[in-house]
Amino acid sequence: MGQFTGKTVLITGASYGLGEGFAEGFAKEGADLVLTARSKDLLEAVAERCRALGSKVTVAPGDVAVEEDVIRVVKTAIAEHGKIDALINNAGVSDMRGVAPEQYDMTTWNWILSIDLNGAFMYIREVGRHMLENHSGNIVNICSIMGSGANEMNVIAYTAAKGALRNLTQQLGCEWADRGVRVNSVSPGFIITEMVRPALEGMGMDKWIASRTPMRRIGELSEIVGPVMFLASDVASYITGHDLMVDGGTNASNGTYQIPPIHHEWNKDTTPKVGTGYPGVSPRPDWYQVMEMGIPGIHYPLPEA
């Protein structure tokens, strides 16, 4: 028997990347799963692998930014499994175009916050209400070291959202502490996932990041799965309102501000320069395809050759 046998875990953003890793990790430890993300096909692929590990899996597609979808997914989870023991609030997006703050458009800002903050809160609220009724439950929010200090990556909306989610974790961790519900977060550093792969490969950041991480390497997926499972487990029963940094020592060394500067020149004028990236490094064209797919109604032209 695994440490999560008999427990149901709801994972948002479960179709790939960190969410996929969390799903398989919990399945290996006996948990039953409710997986949600926008793509049913991608979710089913993850679900099949988890079922092969012996997990009962419910696939519940939905958009984390749509309140009706969040409510429906939570109701489905309770109807199918009878309870939710743990919520892994993982769904998130970022903007790797490198747009300077003074040039940032509100459409992109609102899109990122609608998922990274508003969507996360709606899941906390809906699942939290259920857990409070049962006087039992664990919530683990996936934050980021970007939410704990300044950085030079020009991901201003992502930074704001993750910082707010970290503070929300601390607030609810205290408010619900005597009602049987623990709320914690994990703040990853750079972990190899599909979300950060464009930055690592397209901008040649892997060596830069490693050089500014005390462990001198980038984290692996398995190295974030374990800490998240720890906080969701009974082993962490006296931990709440805590943000666990899993970053190879980056934050402790003040490394969040030592990532190489992208746009020093941008602060000297107000000319929009979307997507110029690092000096001497061309952004990958598929960044713009991903951004165009991710933000409805927005078109990001490829940079001029």
Language model regions located:
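Conserved glycine-rich cofactor-binding loop
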Residues: 15-17
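The beta1-alpha1 cofactor-binding region of Rossmann-like NAD(H)/NADP(H)-dependent oxidoreductases
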Residues: 61-73, 106, 223
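Substrate-binding pocket helix/loop in short-chain dehydrogenase/reductase
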Residues: 98-101, 105-113, 209
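A short, exposed helix-loop element centered on a Lys and neighboring polar residues
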Residues: 124-125, 170
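Alpha-helical segment proximal to the catalytic Tyr-Lys
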Residues: 129, 174-178, 237
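Catalytic loop of short-chain dehydrogenase/reductase
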Residues: 140-164, 169-178, 191
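C-terminal helical subdomain
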Residues: 185, 207-239, 246-248, 273-305
